Amino acid sequence: MAAYHIRQYQEKDHKRVLELFSSGMKELIPAAIRQMLTLPHSLLLLPGVPVTIVLMSASWLLATLYSFLFLLCLWLIFWISCRNYVAKSLQADLADITKSYLNAHGSFWVAESGDQVVGMVGAQPVKDPPLGKKQMQLFRLSVSSQHRGQGIAKALVRTVLQFARDQGYSDVVLETGSVQHSAQALYQAMGFQKTGQYFVSISKKLMGLSILQFSYSLPFASGPGYSGKYLKKGPIPC
């Protein structure tokens, strides 16, 4: 089993963290396309239109060409959307991770294996939490595709949970995309509860891309739950 350790972010990690984030977002494009193809209006355009073309013109070539161009346009739309989101993020909190996260109340960690950064996650306090709540929000969870399925993502989430619990927060909240099925399964398996869902724009609604909200209620510091240091070192679970 490969060894790993989770540590606080350092400036030397910046380039690798940006690479992890960018590659992780690009990997979602095929899943986003598949999800959109299940929507009623997509079923009308594909395969509805090709069938109509064949019935009206008896041309399978024309129908095939239409299908190819339709899928190509979908890919371009999602690629541009992904590129814009990545560019916006790189100009926001990821532009200066130290300034954005490493303050008195937030933090950012990386998972390192064999002197290579293979995962990351951040946490910041929620600015305007519900009355009576003190919430920490989990951000930017990502693990290299070559190191998934080994428990690294779970270890990173546990790091955030322990960090928030040690500081007396009542909940850890997060948002994730509707096409990020593996992330959703991980959060729910760890005890997060889905609390909401919304679309950031009309165009995203047409694409079927929603944002899912999750919350994890933390036990009191003296009660049962996660314990021990949140920065830990050990073998990666199989």
Curated annotation (Swiss-Prot):
It is a multi-pass membrane protein. Residues 69-212 form the N-acetyltransferase domain. Pfam families: Acetyltransf_1 (PF00583). It is an enzyme of class 2 (transferase). GO terms for biological process: gastrulation with mouth forming second; negative regulation of cell adhesion. CDD domains: NAT_SF. The keyword Transmembrane helix applies. SUPFAM superfamilies: Acyl-CoA N-acyltransferases (Nat) (SSF55729). The chain crosses the membrane at residues 36-56, 60-80. The keyword 4Fe-4S does not apply. PROSITE patterns: GNAT. Its EC number is 2.3.1.-. Keywords: Acetylation, Membrane, Transferase, Transmembrane, Transmembrane helix. It comes from the Eukaryota. It is found in: Membrane. GO terms for molecular function: N-acetyltransferase activity. PANTHER family: GNAT FAMILY N-ACETYLTRANSFERASE, N-ACETYLTRANSFERASE 8 (GCN5-RELATED) FAMILY MEMBER 4-RELATED. Probable acetyltransferase. Has no detectable histone acetyltransferase activity towards histone H3 or H4. Belongs to the camello family. This is N-acetyltransferase family 8 member 2. It comes from Mus musculus. The gene is Nat8f2.
